[in-house]
Amino acid sequence: WSGIYCGGSAILAHERLSIVDPQSGGQPLYSPDKKVVLAVNGEIYNHREIRKEYAGKYDFQTGSDCEVILALYQEYGIHFLEKLNGIFAFALYDSEKDEFLIARDPIGVIPLYIGYDSDGKVYCASELKALEGFCERYEPFLPGHCYYSKDGKMTRWYVRDWTQYEAVADAPASVSALREGLEK
């Protein structure tokens, strides 16, 4: 199951390992009106709950767990990432707005790289070798971050208190308590 979308100012290509819905979950995935395109590598753990919530509100085209990303985007625009529980790296292209969103899961389980060519065009890929030869510079796409084409920059979307030193500076640190907790 490999697929390619080429339109507007975006090209999305995907080679799929099918675990959930291997028969009809080919990618890229499309919104019902075909205006939003999604290439994703990942697993959305809460996809059943999201599907249930959107029953009757969104016309799911496949049984793919990742299709819920399209339903969430339809309702929330780019502000839906907090609603996902899972591991993922994706590129979503809205052909009507000619905008794209690239995002990676909070801890970076799924690999993703971003690159820029000499004209400033943006590329992303799950393997670094896919960017070589096209990009003048490239770097790892940071976990818990997204890139929205309208803003043209990387933004941290996954923000928790415990990720800031000030929030945990006074927390007791005990190697023996940690060891005991891990051994249980």
Label for each model-derived stretch:
Residues 1-184:
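Cysteine-centered catalytic environments shared across enzyme families
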